[in-house]
Amino acid sequence: MVDVKCLSDCKLQNQLEKLGFSPGPILPSTRKLYEKKLVQLLVSPPCAPPVMNGPRELDGAQDSDDSEELNIILQGNIILSTEKSKKLKKWPEASTTKRKAVDTYCLDYKPSKGRRWAARAPSTRITYGTITKERDYCAEDQTIESWREEGFPVGLKLAVLGIFIIVVFVYLTVENKSLFG
């Protein structure tokens, strides 16, 4: 029995050469191609004993190796399994718990530190036969109130202070005035 997937590169190359196929270098990118070719050669229906094909008459020049081909057909049991790859790759099973969808509308909203409320789906109501939807996403009142409580962000304050100092420095150097005089 021959397990094509478990053959090393050298053994794969030897098997192909035994069957009359001259493979090139076996690389990870060409390995699957050579495995398929080996399976083709092993599975092909049995014919007469090895046959020597004479030189072909074509217009182009040929090498002496290509002029004679040896066709050997072997019968054998082939295992086309991926047992080796199954053993190596054990994927963790997907969890059955449902993941909550991320609310992309409120990514910039930072809740105040206090009580934590359970996340809920946005409320959608149809009123008086019209198609108006009221959404519970980031209410404008909440963001304005939290901004008033916190004031300006520290980074913004530092940036304004830095720009102010640079403007004062440029003004003093252009006017050639001393800082304390």
From Swiss-Prot:
SUPFAM superfamilies: LEM domain (SSF63451). The keyword Transmembrane applies. GO terms for cellular component: membrane. It is found in: Membrane. Keywords: Membrane, Signal-anchor, Transmembrane, Transmembrane helix. Pfam families: LEM. It is a single-pass membrane protein. Its main location: membrane. The gene is LEMD1. It comes from the Eukaryota. This is LEM domain-containing protein 1. Testis-specific. Isoform 6 is detected in 17 of 18 colon cancer tissues examined. Residues 1-45 form the LEM domain. The chain crosses the membrane at residues 152-172.
